[in-house]
Amino acid sequence: MDLPACRDIRRTGHWSEADDRVTLSYDDRFLRRKRLITVQDKAFLVDLAHTTSLEHGDAFQLEDGRLIECIAADEDLLEVTGPDLTRLAWHIGNRHTPCQIEENRLLIQRDHVIQDMLSQIGATLREVVEPFTPEGGAYGHGRTHGHAH
């Protein structure tokens, strides 16, 4: 059985109404070729030319014209707060850790090594479960494969 294929992504704000939705974790939103299942239990094949980072609210454009909205899944995260949030953000970024930056808190994926480091420099930490939509890379949309130092 041939699956409907997606070879194009429509970014948030550049499409109107979804025919279905697929819920993906942050890590699963970085893909090139993968079989996915929608919330309505319909399978489709993502077959993109390049590995792509999808954001909450982007849409998979299927070849038959349907749009499948990408929803950020709830994930096990660590909420980071403290009197000097800028300093905490610097330490997180210095370790190339994906970080969701909000006005009064930072969110990162749970990692005991980073958690220990943040505790030692005065962060207040709390485990939470919610969607993870970290900042994209400075050199392009979404994630990159890193850079050399």
UniProtKB/Swiss-Prot annotation:
GO cellular component, one term: cytoplasm
Pfam families for this protein: UreE_C, UreE_N
Location, primary (coarse class): cytoplasm
SUPFAM superfamilies, sorted: Urease metallochaperone UreE, C-terminal domain, Urease metallochaperone UreE, N-terminal domain
InterPro entries per record: UreE, UreE_C_dom, UreE_N, UreE_N_sf
UniProt keyword terms in alphabetical order: Chaperone, Cytoplasm, Nickel, Nickel insertion
Localization per record: Cytoplasm
Gene Ontology molecular function: nickel cation binding; unfolded protein binding
Entries under CDD domains matching the protein: UreE (cd00571)
A Gene Ontology biological process term: protein-containing complex assembly
NCBIfam families: PRK13261.2-4
Role: Involved in urease metallocenter assembly. Binds nickel. Probably functions as a nickel donor during metallocenter assembly.
Assigned protein family: Belongs to the UreE family.
Protein name: Urease accessory protein UreE
Gene giving rise to this polypeptide: ureE
